[in-house]
């Protein structure tokens, strides 16, 4: 990948990540509280829906930038012809590697954010300090495996579907899709991926919110899923599915639309520069 492409992916990914995370933060808080083991109202209900936003604001840009730089770089390395039947596999591999890298940045900010969302009376820095003092660095990375195991299936669905929908729309209109069309494709792809991966999101939330030393805090995603199934059944596994779908559909529209528009703008700017 050339330098302009690298820079465009880096900046566009970061801008898209910050935009979507800050706009949709209240929906994410409601979803987290619905999935909390203490229950929606005890976790804060509709009060303080921006609790934990500093953690998200700090982590959004580097997290999204890391994902898209990796995603575009892996696609460039594999360099599959656009007409090839292997193209969806390329997108799957690129998205998977991108998630593994991005989660190194995402998980610490996610741990702090989710604890702040269910403890609205505690400040972000106070929660961050407590985690470091009581659990060390590993506390900030609690749920890394469950997050990766949630994000990879999500991206395996979302990104190939997004790329396929864009390709289909381009073929139907005989020209490359506009940024708003890429955003619409992102909304459909994101909403569908969100629905089918909700149980993994529930397990990830339970692991991150569990008390240190508890069996759930160990990070075993199958045990977390089994515990939810045993106590709450299917409704527990799909807790928060509608706000999650709403947030990620709208998020897909904003995130992938802003990314596509910003990257195209930066590449065009680079071509016009002397």
UniProtKB/Swiss-Prot annotation:
Pfam families the record matches: Mito_carr (PF00153)
SUPFAM superfamilies linked: Mitochondrial carrier
Keywords linked to the UniProt accession: Antiport, Membrane, Mitochondrion, Mitochondrion inner membrane, Repeat, S-adenosyl-L-methionine, Transmembrane, Transmembrane helix, Transport
GO MF entries: S-adenosyl-L-methionine transmembrane transporter activity; S-adenosyl-L-methionine:S-adenosyl-L-homocysteine antiporter activity
Keyword Cell inner membrane among UniProt keywords: no
Gene Ontology CC terms, in alphabetical order: mitochondrial inner membrane
Membrane topology: Multi-pass membrane protein
Solcar repeat intervals: 4-77, 86-168, 177-265
Entry's transmembrane regions: 5-25, 49-69, 85-105, 142-162, 182-202, 238-258
Keyword S-adenosyl-L-methionine belongs to the record: yes
Catalytic reaction annotation: S-adenosyl-L-homocysteine(out) + S-adenosyl-L-methionine(in) = S-adenosyl-L-homocysteine(in) + S-adenosyl-L-methionine(out)
Compartments (UniProt record): Mitochondrion inner membrane
Signal peptide residues on this chain, from the entry's feature table: none
Primary location class: mitochondrion
A GO biological-process term: mitochondrial S-adenosyl-L-methionine transmembrane transport
Family recorded in the similarity comment: Belongs to the mitochondrial carrier (TC 2.A.29) family.
Function as written in the Swiss-Prot or TrEMBL entry: Mitochondrial S-adenosyl-L-methionine/S-adenosyl-L-homocysteine antiporter. Mediates the exchange of cytosolic S-adenosyl-L-methionine, the predominant methyl-group donor for macromolecule methylation processes, for mitochondrial S-adenosylhomocysteine(SAH), a by-product of methylation reactions.
Protein name in UniProt: Mitochondrial S-adenosylmethionine carrier protein
Organism name: Bos taurus (Bovine)
């Amino acid at each position: 990948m050339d330098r302009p492409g690298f820079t465009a992916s880096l900046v566009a990914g970061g801008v898209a990540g910050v935009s979507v995370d800050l706009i949709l933060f209240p929906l994410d808080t409601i979803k987290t509280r619905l999935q909390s083991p203490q229950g929606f109202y005890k976790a804060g209900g509709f009060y303080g829906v921006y609790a934990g936003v500093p953690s998200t604001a700090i982590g959004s840009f580097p997290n999204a930038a890391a994902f898209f730089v990796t995603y575009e770089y892996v696609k460039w390395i594999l360099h599959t012809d656009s007409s090839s039947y292997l193209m969806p596999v390329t997108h799957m591999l690129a998205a998977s590697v991108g998630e593994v890298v991005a989660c190194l940045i995402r998980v610490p900010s996610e741990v702090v954010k989710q604890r702040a969302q269910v403890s609205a009376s505690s400040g972000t820095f106070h929660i961050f300090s407590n985690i470091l003092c009581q659990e060390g660095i590993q506390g900030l990375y609690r749920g890394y495996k469950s997050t990766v195991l949630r994000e990879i299936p999500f991206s395996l669905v979302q990104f190939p579907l997004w790329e396929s929908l864009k390709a289909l729309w381009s073929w139907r209109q005989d020209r490359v899709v506009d940024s708003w069309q890429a955003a619409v494709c992102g909304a459909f792809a994101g909403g569908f991926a969100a629905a089918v991966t909700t149980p993994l999101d529930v397990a990830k939330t339970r692991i991150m919110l569990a008390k240190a030393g508890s069996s759930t805090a160990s990070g075993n995603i199958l045990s977390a899923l089994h515990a939810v199934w045993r106590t709450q059944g299917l409704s527990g596994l799909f807790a928060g599915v509608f706000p999650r779908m709403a947030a990620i559909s709208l998020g897909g529209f904003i995130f992938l639309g802003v990314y596509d528009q910003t990257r195209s703008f930066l590449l065009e700017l680079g071509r016009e520069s002397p």
